[in-house]
């Protein structure tokens, strides 16, 4: 089995390498990035080729390709990989809303990745945990309206912003300790350290950001509810990793807390934490490198009169579940994974 990763030197590429070693430990790897280089990962050194080499007439084919590139490069290389015989899972926004390309969350609509499918779009890092939490509620009670506020880590913006964030944070605290300067005096309001940015991504003419549009449109497509009433406010917060979402839900049919808790706990790749205090959801270490969504803080909305309006919190590692883990689970529909935790429900042993 030959597996290709485009964008192997990035944050998602690194997580893919870790998971591939668990899922397909004997696979041959073909790694690509913007230029020829070497990559140290997990105690091994890998040769990385320039992605442009795939455009040569003698470029080798393979079985499975993960593409973790910006939109313009995904549009350039995904068709070429399909042409070379790969089944392709693309992390960019390029194909997500294309009606001819399935947008898949393992545990929600993985049936869309069939034996005939050659290209699958991997959803945005906030959409994946949100739809994992919503799907068991949709199945049992129906969904009316959804309102989401997300708090998204710096790593969701990419390696360069994360590196700058770490450098500026260390520099700021060092200056505080050595020069006695106040943290607030050191901050650039245009930079991430110490600031909560009230949008994530570029805003359009309506004022909504690209992250907010993705969350709304992708959720409708994945849940197969094109008319779902859903609105989102996405913020960037000064933490390195981990996305949090506070979700207000209106169900079509009323239910009590026990019924909703049972539904959430039954969801594939969901770890449900009972109790309204959010215990188990607050620490960064709780979500770091976890391959599931954490759901908790379930409580009835204070305007509820019939058991239809509820609030809850969803947390996940944006680089793992929100990107690499979902991609690997999708691929397990075609190539069964050695690690059962990286399979999808219809293929996993009970």
Give the location of each predicted region:
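N-terminal Rossmann-like NAD(P) cofactor-binding subdomain of oxidoreductases
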Residues: 1-192, 229, 293-294, 298-306, ...
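Charged docking surfaces used in two-component/phosphorelay signaling
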Residues: 65, 154-350
């Amino acid at each position: 089995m030959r597996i290709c990763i485009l964008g192997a030197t990035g944050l998602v590429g690194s997580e893919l390498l870790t998971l591939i070693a668990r899922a397909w430990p004997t696979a041959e790897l073909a790694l690509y990035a913007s230029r020829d280089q070497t990559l140290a990962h997990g105690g091994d050194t890998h040769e990385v080729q320039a992605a442009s080499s795939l455009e040569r007439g003698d470029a080798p084919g393979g079985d499975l390709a993960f593409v973790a590139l910006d939109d313009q490069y995904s549009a350039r290389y995904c068709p070429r990989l399909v042409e070379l015989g790969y089944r392709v899972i693309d992390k960019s926004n390029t194909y997500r809303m294309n009606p001819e390309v399935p947008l898949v969350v393992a545990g929600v609509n993985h049936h869309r990745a069939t034996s005939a499918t050659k290209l699958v779009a991997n959803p945005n890092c906030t959409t994946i945990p949100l739809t994992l939490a919503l799907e068991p509620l949709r199945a049992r009670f129906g969904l009316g309206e959804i309102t989401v506020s997300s708090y998204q880590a710096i790593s969701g913006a990419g390696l360069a912003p994360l590196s700058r964030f770490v450098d500026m944070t260390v520099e700021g605290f060092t200056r505080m300790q050595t020069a006695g300067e106040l943290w607030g005096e050191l901050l650039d309001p245009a930079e991430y350290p110490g600031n909560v940015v009230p949008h994530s991504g570029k805003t359009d003419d309506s004022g909504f950001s690209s992250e907010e549009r993705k969350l709304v449109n992708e959720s409708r497509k994945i849940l197969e509810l094109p008319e779902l009433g859903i609105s989102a406010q996405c913020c960037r917060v000064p933490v390195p990793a981990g996305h949090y979402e506070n979700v207000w839900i209106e169900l079509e049919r009323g239910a009590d807390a026990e019924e909703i808790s049972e539904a959430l706990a039954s969801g594939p790749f969901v770890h449900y934490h009972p109790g309204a205090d959010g215990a188990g959801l607050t620490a960064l270490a709780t979500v770091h490198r976890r391959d599931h969504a954490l759901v908790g803080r379930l409580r009835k909305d204070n305007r509820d009169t019939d058991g239809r309006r509820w609030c809850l919190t969803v947390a996940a590692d944006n680089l793992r579940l929100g990107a690499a883990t979902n991609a690997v689970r999708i691929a397990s529909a075609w190539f069964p994974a050695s690690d059962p935790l990286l399979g999808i429900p219809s293929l996993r042993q009970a």
